[in-house]
Amino acid sequence: HSLSRRQRQMCIRDSTRLPYDPNLSKKLLAEAGYPDGFEITLDCPNNRYINDEAICVAAVGMFAKVGIKVNLDAQPKSIHFKDLQNGLSDFYMLGWGVPTFDSHYVYSFLLKSDGSWNKVGFKSDRVDELVGTMLTETNLEQRNANIAEAWAIVQDNMPYLPLHHQVISWATKSNVDVPIRTNNEPV
């Protein structure tokens, strides 16, 4: 699941998608000391998201284009998420839905220094401070400014690599009524 500001309450500035540029990627890898790329394992669930393993297979091919050899380890979600929570993965697929449609939900779990799902180790004292204001600031204009500042810091640091936004479509016949919650699950 992408960390897209477009879907959240606080859409302040447009999100800029990074360009697809394999040559720039190779150049940056060389500058970082990896002129010949490197090898890493991508941990991926194979029964949690729609086409999760297929998405990871596609990512493996994309990384290969810039010289990064990715070994795919696709496992059932019961193993995958347990390994993530125990800090046993350095590179992994993680989806994140936001049933509240508010930035605080994303930040408190994924981007706050002590967030329970901040497994990438992202740390920013300023972001932590801004996350605190998301709970207490009652002036909506100021709250949105704080959120925009936090998103700018995160975008500049890129602790996560957003791949896609999973959209689930539901359809029924006119004689069937199935209420759907914001987390895409039927009631």
Where are the regions a protein language model picked out?
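Short, well-ordered beta-strand elements
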Residues: 37-47, 70-73, 90
